[in-house]
Amino acid sequence: MTLLYEGKAKRIFSTNQENELRVEYKDEVTAGNGAKKDTMAGKGRLNNQITSIIFKYLQENGIESHFIKQLSETEQLVKPVKIIPLEVVVRNIASGSITKRLGFENGEVFRESLVEFFYKNDALNDPLITDDHIKLLNIATDKDIETLKTKALEINQVLKKLMDAMNLKLVDFKIEFGKTETGQILLADEISPDTCRIWDKATNANFDKDVYRNNTGSLIETYQIFLNKLEDLK
């Protein structure tokens, strides 16, 4: 078993199967592209368990991903994919960077869900890019871009129903996709309170990493409550 990659939140290892990788979720938490950083015991366990439940739910609703199964509290088995260097962001309600960038009021509900692309490049601070930029950088073709948008909006619809069942609002989320050796585009990485902005329907209280970004609550307690809500739906 060889360490293939280590990022801010995860380590990826080879296995004795060519078409399987092991992902280990770390206890590190970051914000602002790593400008704020801490280690919190239990964070890896929570994100692994949450992502495993959500990916299984998505698969049950026709959304294919790299996820195979959960291996332990902090590990899961996934299919190998070549990650497309884009963060695909879907926004249902204005919050975060878009309020500063375009002047929307925080909490403003969009008439239609918005899809944005950000270039995964730490040196450039992951800038917002257009479809034309994506093609100029040879990141993806027109066909791939349309596939990413379609899949992102399909995932949004499924996730909104899931959050609704927990009396939560899906404000926005970011996802990543990868390509298999045959060129199939699959949902990859994770979906957790690290990658989503989730509000309580009644109070607009955060159930996401904004409690850490803004120092408004305990990240571990918040994520545990979110996991409990997910498990209560089973």
From Swiss-Prot:
Protein's GO biological process: 'de novo' IMP biosynthetic process; cobalamin biosynthetic process
Gene3D superfamilies: ATP-grasp fold, B domain (3.30.470.20), Phosphorylase Kinase, domain 1 (3.30.200.20)
Main enzyme class: ligase
Pathway(s) this gene product operates in, as recorded in its UniProt entry: Purine metabolism; IMP biosynthesis via de novo pathway; 5-amino-1-(5-phospho-D-ribosyl)imidazole-4-carboxamide from 5-amino-1-(5-phospho-D-ribosyl)imidazole-4-carboxylate: step 1/2
Keyword terms, alphabetized: ATP-binding, Ligase, Nucleotide-binding, Purine biosynthesis
Record InterPro entries: SAICAR_synt/ADE2_N, SAICAR_synt_PurC, SAICAR_synth, SAICAR_synthetase, SAICAR_synthetase_CS
Presence of keyword Ligase: yes
Its EC number(s): 6.3.2.6
Pfam families, sorted: SAICAR_synt
Reaction(s) the record says it catalyses: 5-amino-1-(5-phospho-D-ribosyl)imidazole-4-carboxylate + L-aspartate + ATP = (2S)-2-[5-amino-1-(5-phospho-beta-D-ribosyl)imidazole-4-carboxamido]succinate + ADP + phosphate + 2 H(+)
GO molecular function, one term: phosphoribosylaminoimidazolesuccinocarboxamide synthase activity
HAMAP family: SAICAR_synth
Family label: Belongs to the SAICAR synthetase family.
PANTHER family documented for this protein: MULTIFUNCTIONAL PROTEIN ADE2 (PTHR43599), SI:DKEY-6E2.2 (PTHR43599:SF3)
Protein's UniProt name: Phosphoribosylaminoimidazole-succinocarboxamide synthase
Organism of provenance: Staphylococcus aureus (strain bovine RF122 / ET3-1)
